[in-house]
A protein has these predicted regions:
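Σ70-family region 2.3-2.4 aromatic/basic alpha-helix that recognizes the −10 promoter
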Residues: 110
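Class I (Rossmann-like) S-adenosyl-L-methionine-dependent methyltransferase catalytic domain
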Residues: 1-46, 52-107, 121-136, 141-244
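Short catalytic micro-motifs in class I SAM-dependent methyltransferases
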Residues: 116-120
């Protein structure tokens, strides 16, 4: 989708998601899961493709320190106005989400949110975004990714689970859940979004215990073998004393 054109003509139905109660309740539930009943502040959050900042503002209200990035300056201006009206402080950055590691956005971020950018990228862009997110996310970070399934439709490409996994090779998909969002009926029938939330967590690599590793077993086997050899040579020497 050409988002620059869409904003220039005032076409941004995704902003209506904030008025969709089932969707709003679901995203609020997901935010609550990451907050884990802790008192704010909750840490740094990055809103990727923030647009006019609807969900970044919601995160800021909940006690997150939010940075929003988008390539559409008109959307960012709307976001700054919305944040001012809501009385929250959000840092809005003009930049390309496929070059996050080259953009001065700060970090590391404990939460990365994308409510509809990734799934309209081609393979190269998806992998570039995945690398950038990995570069700016903290070691204990969570990614919440809103994705339309891959199918033939106008406007939005969509992405499959395998494509999500390929773009984030150092992350584990822990949850895939319906978003409960519905477009107005004509658009819903045309686009068939059937969107889902993907929750990803960094893969942690635990070193093998030395006492259980193959090298340790090999060293133990060698030591036992050497001891047996010594004992065998000793017994042979004793027997040889009485021989003619």
């Amino acid at each position: 989708m050409n988002y620059r054109l869409a904003y220039s003509i005032g076409f941004h139905p995704w902003e209506d998601a904030a008025c969709d109660q089932p969707f709003s309740e679901k995203i609020s539930e997901m935010f609550g899961r990451e907050e884990n009943a802790r008192e704010p502040p909750h840490g740094s959050a990055l809103d990727v493709g923030t647009g006019s900042g609807i969900w970044g503002i919601e995160l800021a209200k909940r006690g997150w320190q939010v940075t929003g990035i988008d390539i559409i300056e008109k959307a960012l201006r709307r976001g700054r106005e919305r944040a001012h009206d809501a009385g929250v402080d959000i840092r809005f950055v003009h930049g390309d989400v496929t070059t996050l590691e080259q953009t001065d956005i700060g970090g590391p971020f404990r939460l990365v949110l994308d409510t509809g950018t990734f799934h309209d990228f081609d393979e190269r862009q998806r992998k570039a975004m995945g690398r950038g997110v990995s570069a700016v996310a903290s070691s204990d970070a969570t990614v919440l990714l809103l994705v339309w399934p891959k199918r033939r439709r106008p406007l939005i490409r969509g992405a499959s689970r395998n494509e999500v996994a390929a773009a984030f090779p150092d992350w584990e998909i822990t949850h895939v859940e319906p978003s409960h969002f519905r477009l107005p009926k004509p658009l819903d029938l045309l686009l068939r979004p059937d969107e889902h939330w993907y929750r990803l967590r960094r893969i942690t690599h635990t070193p093998a215990s030395p006492s259980c590793g193959g090298d340790a077993r090999q060293r133990l086997g060698s030591a036992v073998g050497r001891r047996s050899d010594r004992e065998g040579r000793g017994r042979g020497a004793v027997r040889g004393i009485g021989e003619p």
